[in-house]
Design a protein with these regions (language model features):
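Long, charge-rich, low-complexity alpha-helical segments
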Residues: 28-76
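Intrinsically disordered, low-complexity and often Lys/Arg-enriched segments
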Residues: 1-5, 75-76
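A short, structured beta-strand/loop element
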Residues: 3-43
Length: 76
């Protein structure tokens, strides 16, 4: 079955100022992507955040790709 980021990520106004978070948590997708970008391994992230699974990390990457692929530019 194809993984859908929508199954793992949500935005709620009352949680983390509406930033995308992993469902059922206050953990932002932004934070996890920053951790990956600074060189933290997936194994380290999963050990540090036991509520996450490898599928959550894949969902974060798919979410990021979806944003980049949008027709509207986010650059200022």
């Amino acid at each position: 079955m194809k993984l859908k980021w929508q199954d793992y990520i949500e935005e709620r106004k009352e949680v983390m100022m509406g930033k995308p978070v992993f469902k059922g948590t206050r953990l932002t997708v932004e934070h996890i992507l920053q951790e990956l970008g600074t060189g933290m391994s997936q194994e380290e992230i999963l050990a540090g955040y036991p509520q996450l699974t490898p599928e959550h990390l894949r969902a974060a990457m798919l979410f990021s790709a979806a944003l980049i692929g949008m027709d509207q530019s986010i650059y200022v």
